[in-house]
């Protein structure tokens, strides 16, 4: 089993847009195999580290390490990952784990640290339409009915609307301050080229036919992921995105998928985005990251010497990972974004 986050072409696309070199940790032991797609990053110039030093992060999304056919050899694989990473002067590695692919926590914690970021929301597609609507929050239902009455409609896989979706997507990312996800239309064209018939565009149209909300969904192995979404600034008060989920639930169920995964809040936070998604389903899954310090001495040195505006040493953060990449604002800047937010959009790395 694998998800679209593990496709080599997807990892390369992420590396291009997020910065870094696409690579993967791959190993075999007896009849078992291990794969962890990553993006290798140079360290920030402000650290004055050796040019040979680097770190790595998994590509955007739930690109968890895969091990098959069983996890019996997971400790041996993790030991091999650490050994190879040390040879390549990798200081630290950050992995995003998959909510529906659980790795043995005991084995993981022997080598690194698991961090629970919160819950993700999903829809069990085995339930009937009536059972689904019983779970939907009352104000979501009311808003949905009002949108239908006002003539809003949904289209699925009409790619003539990609440019319009991209425009409102970029406006949305600027509105919420997610500069690292400010993808161009070419990104979506490239993503479609990679994923082919697995990628789907769902758009909400006003009575005039204008695209006022939309989402990119990816279907693979019985899972449908709500990957990226947007709402037009001048239509926020109408909540047109409340039409997306019921439409894609019915569509996904009709194609015999098992789960429609909506994801969680920004960085796993229990924020307004999480609240919106939780209004459609009671079903939740845990979202973890896995943090691996490959070279403790280098990691501590870099974390202590991470530059501050005043040129003073910075204490090692126990939350942000890696600590030496923690944003440090100048006196004239706003406070840094939350740890969860940054982790969610931290570019992935493959090594």
Located regions from the model:
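Conserved acyl-donor/pantetheine-binding loop and adjacent beta-alpha core of acyl/acetyltransferases
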Residues: 40-62
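A conserved beta-strand-loop-helix scaffold within acyl/acetyltransferase catalytic domains
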Residues: 1-47, 97-237, 350
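A gly/proline- and charged-residue-enriched helix-loop-helix capping module
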Residues: 56-103
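Short, high-confidence coil segments that cap the C-terminus of an alpha-helix
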Residues: 20-22, 87-90, 255-257
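Aromatic/hydrophobic pocket-lining residues that form the small-molecule binding cavity
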Residues: 74, 78, 140, 245
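A short, internal acetyl-CoA/4′-phosphopantetheine-binding micro-motif in the GNAT/acyltransferase core
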Residues: 60-72, 126-127, 229-238, 266
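Aromatic (often tryptophan-rich) hydrophobic motifs at membrane interfaces
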Residues: 26, 44, 79, 187-303
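Active-site/acyl-donor-binding loops of N-acyltransferases
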Residues: 39-42, 106-131, 255-351
């Amino acid at each position: 089993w694998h998800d679209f986050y593990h496709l080599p072409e997807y990892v390369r696309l992420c590396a291009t847009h997020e910065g870094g070199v696409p690579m993967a940790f791959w190993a075999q032991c007896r009849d078992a195999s291990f794969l962890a797609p990553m993006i290798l990053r140079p360290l920030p110039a402000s650290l004055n580290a050796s040019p040979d030093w680097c770190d790595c992060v998994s590509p955007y999304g739930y690109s968890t390490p895969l091990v098959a056919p069983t996890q019996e050899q997971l400790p041996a694989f993790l030991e091999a990952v650490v050994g190879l990473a040390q040879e390549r002067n990798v200081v630290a590695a950050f992995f995003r784990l998959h909510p529906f692919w659980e790795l043995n926590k005991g084995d993981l914690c022997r080598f690194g640290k698991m961090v629970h970021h919160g819950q993700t929301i999903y829809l069990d597609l085995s339930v009937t339409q009536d059972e689904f609507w019983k779970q939907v929050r009352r104000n979501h239902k009311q808003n949905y009915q009002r949108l239908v009455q006002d003539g809003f409609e949904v289209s699925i896989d009409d790619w003539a609307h990609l440019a319009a979706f991209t425009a409102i997507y970029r406006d949305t990312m600027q509105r919420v301050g997610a500069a690292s996800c400010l993808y161009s239309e070419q990104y979506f064209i490239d993503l479609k080229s990679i994923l082919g018939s697995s990628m789907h565009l769902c758009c909400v149209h006003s009575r005039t036919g204008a695209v006022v909300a939309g989402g990119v969904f990816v279907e693979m192995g019985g899972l449908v992921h709500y990957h990226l979404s947007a709402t037009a600034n001048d239509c926020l008060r109408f909540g047109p995105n409340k039409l997306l989920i019921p439409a894609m639930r019915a569509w996904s169920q009709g194609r015999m998928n098992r789960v429609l995964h909506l994801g969680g809040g920004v960085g796993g936070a229990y924020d307004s985005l999480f609240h919106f998604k939780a209004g459609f389903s009671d079903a939740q899954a845990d979202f973890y990251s896995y943090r691996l310090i490959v070279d403790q001495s280098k990691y501590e040195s870099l974390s202590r010497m991470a530059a501050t505006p005043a040129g003073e040493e910075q204490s090692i953060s126990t939350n942000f990972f890696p600590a030496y990449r923690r944003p440090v604002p100048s006196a004239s800047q706003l406070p840094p974004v939350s740890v969860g937010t940054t982790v969610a959009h931290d570019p992935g790395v493959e090594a």
